[in-house]
Curated annotation (Swiss-Prot):
Taxonomy of the source species: Eukaryota, Metazoa, Chordata, Craniata, Vertebrata
Protein name stated in the entry: Cytoplasmic dynein 2 light intermediate chain 1
Functional summary from the UniProt entry: Acts as one of several non-catalytic accessory components of the cytoplasmic dynein 2 complex (dynein-2 complex), a motor protein complex that drives the movement of cargos along microtubules within cilia and flagella in concert with the intraflagellar transport (IFT) system, facilitating the assembly of these organelles. Involved in the regulation of ciliary length.
GO molecular function, one term: dynein heavy chain binding
Disease field: Short-rib thoracic dysplasia 15 with polydactyly: A form of short-rib thoracic dysplasia, a group of autosomal recessive ciliopathies that are characterized by a constricted thoracic cage, short ribs, shortened tubular bones, and a 'trident' appearance of the acetabular roof. Polydactyly is variably present. Non-skeletal involvement can include cleft lip/palate as well as anomalies of major organs such as the brain, eye, heart, kidneys, liver, pancreas, intestines, and genitalia.
Tissues/organs with expression: Expressed in bone, brain, kidney, and cartilage. Lower expression in heart, liver, lung, placenta and thymus.
Recorded family membership: Belongs to the dynein light intermediate chain family.
Broad class of where this protein is predominantly found: Golgi
Biological processes, Gene Ontology terms: determination of left/right symmetry; intraciliary retrograde transport; intraciliary transport involved in cilium assembly; regulation of cilium assembly
Organism: Homo sapiens
Gene: DYNC2LI1
Residues annotated as signal peptide: none
InterPro entries: DYNC2LI1 (IPR040045), Dynein_light_int_chain (IPR022780), P-loop_NTPase (IPR027417)
GO cellular component: apical part of cell; axoneme; centrosome; ciliary basal body; ciliary tip; ciliary transition zone; cilium; cytoplasm
Length: 351
C-alpha cells in the first residue's frame, strides 16, 4: 500500500477535526481578537503582559500595537490563538479604531475599555468618545457583513444577549454593546483614598454604564490578587476559559461584576437630590447620569485630552541617522516653500 502524501495526511487531519468539532455544542473558533482601548497611561499594556505571562517592563504605546498569545485547552490539542490589539494615545487616535475591526475578525471580537480611576475628570469624556467611535465603526462593519452573511450577524446578536438572563428585570431597558465589552477601572490603589462621596458617584456611574451596555465591570491595581482576577477575565475573552460568576458591588472594595449579574434596581438612582434631577433636562437615562457625573467631575477642555506631543520627536524612539535625515528634509522643505513663495510673488508682479 503506497504511503500517504503530506497533503493527504493534512486533509485527513482537517476532516477529523471537523467531525470532532461537530459533536456536542460544537467547537469554538480557535482564533479570537481582543482590542484594548482606554485612558492614556491607564495600564492597558501592563494588563496584556500579565495575561500573557510576560515578565517585561511595559513601554508606552505609540499608536496601535499588536501582539498575540497561544494556549492549548488540553493535552495533544492544537493551541488556540488570541490576537491582542492596543490603541495608544487615549482619545487622540480614534481613526485607528477601524484597523483591528473587520468583517473577518468581528465574529470572535471583544473590547476591553481601561479607564484611569485616578483621573475622574477625564473618565467620562474618554469613555464616551472611545465607545461612540468604536460602536459607530462596528455598526458599519455589521451592516456590511449582513449583506453577505445575515446568519453570522444574527448569531452575533444572539450571542451578545446570552449574557443577560431572559427573566432579568432589565431585559427591555438595556442596549447591549454590539461586541462583548469589559470595562476595567485601573489604579484602584489611588482611587481607594478618594472621599467616600466621590467614590460612590464613580462606582454607581460605571455600574450604570456597564449594565446598560451589557458589559462586565471590574477594578484593578498593582495588587497581584486583583491582577489575577483580571487575567482570568481576559483569558475568558481570549481563550474561552470558564467565566467567573463572583460579584462585588461594595464601593469600599474593588468592584467585580460579571455581565448580567447587576441590575438598575441594585444600582439605584443617580446620586443627586431628587429636587435637582428635574433641573438637569436630560433626554435619556444615559444623559442624566452624564450630567450628574460631570456636575461633580467637570471635564477638562477636549484639547487637553488629546496628546499634542509629536511622536516623531519622542527620545524613546530616537534613531540618529533617521533623525538627521529628517532634519535635512525639513530644511529642504522650508527652502522649497520660501522659493515657491518668491516665484508666485514674482509672477504676480509681472502680471
Amino acid at each position: 500500500m503506497p504511503s500517504e502524501t503530506l497533503w493527504e495526511i493534512a486533509k485527513a487531519e482537517v476532516e477529523k477535526r471537523g467531525i470532532n468539532g461537530s459533536e456536542g455544542d460544537g467547537a469554538e473558533i480557535a482564533e479570537k481578537f481582543v482590542f484594548f482601548i482606554g485612558s492614556k497611561n491607564g495600564g492597558k499594556t501592563t494588563i496584556i503582559l500579565r495575561c500573557l505571562d510576560r515578565d517585561e517592563p511595559p513601554k508606552p504605546t505609540l499608536a496601535l500595537e499588536y501582539t498575540y498569545g497561544r494556549r492549548a485547552k488540553g493535552h495533544n490539542t492544537p493551541k488556540d490563538i488570541a490576537h491582542f490589539w492596543e490603541l495608544g494615545g487615549g482619545t487622540s487616535l480614534l481613526d485607528l479604531i477601524s484597523i483591528p475591526i473587520t468583517g473577518d475578525t468581528l465574529r470572535t471580537f471583544s473590547l476591553v475599555l481601561v479607564l484611569d480611576l485616578s483621573k475622574p475628570n477625564d473618565l467620562w469624556p474618554t469613555m464616551e468618545n472611545l465607545l461612540q467611535a468604536t460602536k459607530s465603526h462596528v455598526d458599519k462593519v455589521i451592516m456590511k457583513l449582513g449583506k453577505t452573511n445575515a446568519k453570522a450577524v444574527s448569531e452575533m446578536r444572539q450571542k451578545i444577549w446570552n449574557n443577560m438572563p431572559k427573566d432579568h428585570p432589565d431585559h427591555e431597558l438595556i442596549d447591549p454593546f454590539p461586541v462583548p465589552l469589559v470595562i476595567i477601572g485601573s489604579k484602584y490603589d489611588v482611587f481607594q483614598d478618594f472621599e467616600s462621596e466621590k467614590r460612590k458617584v464613580i462606582c454607581k456611574t460605571l455600574r450604570f454604564v456597564a449594565h446598560y451596555y451589557g458589559a462586565s465591570l471590574m477594578f484593578t491595581s498593582k495588587s497581584e490578587a486583583l491582577l489575577l482576577k483580571i487575567r482570568g477575565v481576559i483569558n475568558q475573552l481570549a481563550f474561552g476559559i470558564d467565566k467567573s460568576k463572583s460579584i462585588c458591588v461594595d464601593q469600599n472594595k474593588p468592584l467585580f461584576i460579571t455581565a448580567g449579574l447587576d441590575s438598575f434596581g441594585q444600582i439605584g438612582s443617580p446620586p443627586v437630590p431628587e429636587n435637582d434631577i428635574g433641573k438637569l433636562h436630560a433626554h435619556s437615562p444615559m444623559e442624566l447620569w452624564k450630567k450628574v457625573y460631570e456636575k461633580l467631575f467637570p471635564p477638562k477642555s477636549i484639547n487637553t485630552l488629546k496628546d499634542i506631543k509629536d511622536p516623531a520627536r519622542d527620545p524613546q524612539y530616537a534613531e540618529n541617522e533617521v533623525d538627521e535625515m529628517r532634519i535635512q528634509k525639513d530644511l529642504e522643505l522650508e527652502q522649497y516653500k520660501r522659493s515657491s513663495s518668491k516665484s508666485w510673488k514674482q509672477i504676480e508682479l509681472d502680471s
